[in-house]
Amino acid sequence: MLNKLFIGLLVVAFINACGNSTKKEEPSKKGRVLEYTNTLSFLDENGNVVSTLRFEKADDPAERNQGLMDVNSMPADAGMVFYFDTEEPQSFWMMNTPLSLDIMYVSADSTIVSIYKSTTPFSDKSLPSGKPAKYVIETNAGYSISNDIKEGMKVRF
């Protein structure tokens, strides 16, 4: 009788262990969620507003290093703006960034000096500004094309 009970418990324990070993944890798909509490405007050559963007501000080293890494989605009218202490050549990459982005480099006088359109997610390729920049604006891919934003335009923060 004890033998049958012992064997029964072993069988139950074995089945339970096998059942748990095939269960896989789903990776979190949430990602980071941002608050877009600031706004900026893109201006045409006459100073008219072409588009307005809500944005999360990254103005310290930790925020700039984190950027949009692990952000899985953004509203169409939202992005992130990186503020640097000095105007100098900048270079970004897409490491750990699941979204395709438009990256706009902006000089200290608020002129867009270069734009990278529809960047490749997770890429470690360097995307240099080419000219000195004090600000970098990241938006969803296609934002600059759909809003007719071009190099030489001004940004009003």
Regions found by a protein language model. Name each.
Residues 2-8:
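Sec-dependent signal peptide recognition
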Residues 14-17:
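C-terminal motif of bacterial Sec signal peptides marking the signal peptidase cleavage site
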Residues 19-157:
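Compact, glycine-rich, soluble single-domain proteins
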